[in-house]
């Protein structure tokens, strides 16, 4: 698998939300169902308010040797007192299966923790369509703090965990 992934020349450009991409991020929150941890829906105005209130909002453009997939990842992280809360993390299904979902989230967490020094919390809220993300956070270094009878899981990120991002991925923050 490593040889195959290395042969793809995968480049992930992680971009802070701006006027040029915020409508695409809003669109993704409204349409992405399968790989969506909390299935929160936001308008462009909602996202602008979140930015004004100090949230960190990113999107990612993924390209490989076959072409440019465009903006296919959205991530919203809120600052809540002494923690960062992963409000939303979602991906277009067309880029799944190349570990891009893992390396992008870990890169964003590492970036934000280096800037803020804050602990990261997250949540999984089950929906009719997002079962594929049920255990995703556990696979990328989060520990379950609690789970309620409806299947809502609350997590903390294990920041002591060594984050391995294979060197055949190129990650750029823009």
Place the predicted regions along the sequence by residue.
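Acyl-donor binding region in acyl/amide transferases
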Residues: 65, 71-148
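Short acidic (Asp/Glu) and glycine-rich catalytic loops that position anionic groups and cofactors
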Residues: 4-8, 28-31, 85, 114-118
